[in-house]
A protein has these predicted regions:
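Glycine-rich phosphate-binding loops of nucleotide-dependent enzymes
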Residues: 2-234
Length: 234
């Protein structure tokens, strides 16, 4: 695997009963790259992400990660996380009865649950929440936050996991323009730190604004991969 590549998927196929969801798909993510993943509903975007993160198994192919000896198989989202992959799905998967701060740390510091407050959070986590304008909600229960705020909290949690690869599954669908811009600022900072980002979106204008490359799926096939700067403006 090339030195600048953080993630590589080769010849990945996945079949559900009566449906060929992915057919011999290749995908490469470079370090410090924001890579858009686009396609119509049913194209295979969600399946690709779920194969990568261990939600689904796959029939053929291999996944390679920077720093791993040989191919990896993620049998669960927890294994994917151990390999340095953090994912934020469109449907937020957090604990509504815990505070924002507790959700940021859950799964890593279980002894602190029920004791975490704004003052116990480390400087990095504090700065991260501030950058997304959710610092004032740190001691609020998640269920008291809007859907958009919950999405930003899920993004903050994923970023705080110190990942090599960050997968954002349509993260802007519930955000307003100001929140989208704050997210893009954060994505650019992560890019500068060498994090590879997979950005699933239906909005081509957002691809022009923040992405380096784009991969297009159709009916389970990869139909094109292009540098964004070479795309015609439409």
């Amino acid at each position: 695997m090339e030195n600048n590549v953080v993630l590589s998927m080769h010849d990945i196929s996945k079949t559900f009963p009566g449906v060929k969801a992915l057919q011999h798909v290749d995908f490469t993510l470079r370090k410090g790259e924001i890579h858009a993943l686009m396609g119509e509903n049913g194209a295979g975007k969600s399946t690709l992400i779920k194969v990568l993160t261990g939600v689904h198994s796959f029939e053929s192919g291999e996944i390679l990660m920077a720093g791993s000896d040989g191919a990896i198989i993620n049998r669960s989202p927890q294994e994917a996380q151990e390999h340095g992959i953090s994912t934020v799905y469109q449907e937020v998967n957090l604990c509504p009865n815990l505070t924002v701060a507790e959700n940021l740390f859950i799964g890593r510091e279980p002894k602190k649950l029920g004791m975490i407050d704004w003052h116990t959070m480390n400087k990095k986590s504090t700065a991260l929440l501030k950058s997304l304008s959710i610092d004032a909600r740190a001691t609020d229960k998640l269920e008291e936050c809007s859907i958009a705020k919950q999405q930003m909290i899920a993004i903050a949690r994923a970023v705080d996991m110190k990942c090599q690869v960050l997968i954002l599954d349509e993260p802007t669908s519930s955000l307003d323009d100001e929140e989208v811009e704050k997210l893009f600022v954060l994505m650019r900072k992560l890019k500068d730190q060498g994090v590879g980002i997979i950005f699933v979106t239906h909005f081509l204008e957002q691809v022009y604004e923040v992405c380096d490359r784009i991969t297009v799926l159709r009916n389970g096939h990869l139909v094109g991969e292009y540098p964004v700067k070479e795309l015609p403006r439409v």
